[in-house]
């Protein structure tokens, strides 16, 4: 189980049909292919200094069952840094299968909303290895690959699911994701007010200015996708910026 005292910059690798892609606002039709070789992409991020990777099985998220596990296993065997994985994890069997591959932690999204008791049991069975993904739109929790909204507000759901003792909460504003329009600072601040669980930010991070703004919040890290692939953000620069701001906080 990976632990870090520093704020992590986590490159995202979204898998669909065996390729590394990015979706705009989670829409299937708005897909951009960034690599036909996700294993090579994972090695690239490791070589550039990534300490952790965020893998998402988009096919699994849409279909409710992981579809790219052979590829995930291949990635894990070819790199040395830890990875987290999400997408289609709706059963205890699926979670165990993924963890047995060597994934550091798994991300539970839709099923956490549908079955909070199951999440409590899961966190107890695999302490420190269960992350909760909260996908939000206008302050409301989104589920089923971002295709539906539920009745939970982000803050109410976070307060409730925190009782299960997840290792981390990953917050994504889906209206921002893939848009390169900046992160949801206000939503993150609201979330941080109601939970003590470490929070990782995702969605809309488009520039070093965004990285700097997030680095001043009390978060554990940030997941960056499209901006790394397009070159809007250099991984080394983002890591350096977080290190500088962390030093300033302690002075």
What are the language-model segments listed below?
Residues 8-12, 52, 80-84, 105-107, ...:
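Structural preference for beta-strand elements that scaffold enzyme active sites
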Residues 14, 45, 53, 98, ...:
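Conserved, mostly hydrophobic/aromatic
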Residues 17-29, 96, 103-177:
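Conserved anion-binding
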Residues 52-70, 110, 171-181:
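Glycine-rich, proline-tolerant flexible connector loops at the mouths of alpha/beta enzymes
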Residues 59, 65-124:
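Glycine/small-residue-rich loop that forms an oxyanion/phosphate-binding "nest" at active or ligand-binding sites
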Residues 66-73, 147-156, 181-189:
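Charged helix-capping and loop-helix junction motifs
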Residues 79, 83-104, 186-221:
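Catalytic cores of alpha/beta
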Residues 118-125, 130, 215-224, 228-251:
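C-terminal helical cap(s) of enzyme catalytic domains, especially alpha/beta-barrels
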